[in-house]
């Protein structure tokens, strides 16, 4: 685990949702873990991680939370803000982990979509996460503002959007929607068949 708060310049560089993210070879993951008790929730931990020694950050987080003694009788909500969406292998590990821990839910807000040039399996990884109940969305100004005030050593500076933040968020949201769209259509068809008694 690194220091509790991320350096301001590092956050702006790593999380910037630019179309061509040249040189950004690491994934950063800011997280919040909450325990839900009926209508209220309690923050248990927050911080950030990054890839280390060739190990992807998603797997580092799974190792980290596996060391906790999570009460199977309580519900936990984990929220990630990531600089890149998970690769196919990490998505598979996360989905398997969630299946083994049904009392834990995960939301992922990502700055950019990761696509490995040689495999093109990453969209299927995102669909697999979605099927496992993970809520996946692209970061918007509101999410960047929250991260800036929660995870960044900002020295009381106000978060300022860079040129193109909104447009890139919209573009990436549409792309993510197209990736997940087949799932929505299949769910709609299943509901229609059930309604018709087929």
UniProtKB/Swiss-Prot annotation:
EC number: 3.5.4.38
Outcome recorded upon mutating residue 24 to W: In HIGM2; completely abolishes nuclear import and interaction with CTNNBL1, diminishes interaction with KPNA1 and abolishes immunoglobulin class switching
Motif Bipartite nuclear localization signal, residue numbers: 1-30
Residue ranges of the region described as Interaction with SUPT6H: 2-26
InterPro entries registered for this protein in UniProt: APOBEC/CMP_deaminase_Zn-bd (IPR016192), APOBEC_Cyt_Deaminase (IPR050610), APOBEC_N (IPR013158), CMP_dCMP_dom (IPR002125), Cytidine_deaminase-like (IPR016193)
Annotated catalysed reactions: a 2'-deoxycytidine in single-stranded DNA + H2O + H(+) = a 2'-deoxyuridine in single-stranded DNA + NH4(+)
Region listing for Important for interaction with CTNNBL1, in residue ranges: 39-42
Similarity remark: Belongs to the cytidine and deoxycytidylate deaminase family.
Name this protein carries in UniProt: Single-stranded DNA cytosine deaminase
Organism: Homo sapiens (Human)
Source lineage: Eukaryota, Metazoa, Chordata, Craniata, Vertebrata
């Amino acid at each position: 685990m690194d220091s509790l708060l991320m350096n301001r310049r590092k956050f702006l560089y790593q999380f910037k949702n630019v179309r061509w993210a040249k040189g950004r070879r690491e994934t950063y993951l800011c997280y919040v873990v909450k325990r839900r008790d009926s209508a209220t929730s309690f923050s248990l931990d927050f911080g950030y991680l990054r890839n280390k020694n060739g190990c992807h950050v998603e797997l580092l987080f799974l190792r980290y939370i596996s060391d906790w003694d999570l009460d199977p009788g309580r519900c936990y909500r984990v929220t990630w803000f990531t600089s890149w969406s998970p690769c196919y292998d990490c998505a598979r590990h996360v989905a398997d982990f969630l299946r083994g821990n049904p009392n834990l839910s995960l939301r992922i807000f990502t700055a950019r979509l990761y696509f490995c040039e040689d495999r093109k399996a990453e969209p299927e990884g995102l669909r697999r996460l979605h099927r496992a109940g993970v809520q996946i969305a692209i970061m918007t100004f509101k999410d960047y503002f929250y991260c800036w005030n929660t995870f960044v050593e900002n020295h009381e500076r106000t978060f300022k959007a860079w040129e193109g933040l909104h447009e890139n968020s919209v573009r990436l949201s549409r792309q993510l929607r197209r990736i997940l769209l087949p799932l929505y259509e299949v769910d709609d068809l299943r509901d229609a068949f059930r309604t018709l008694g087929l």
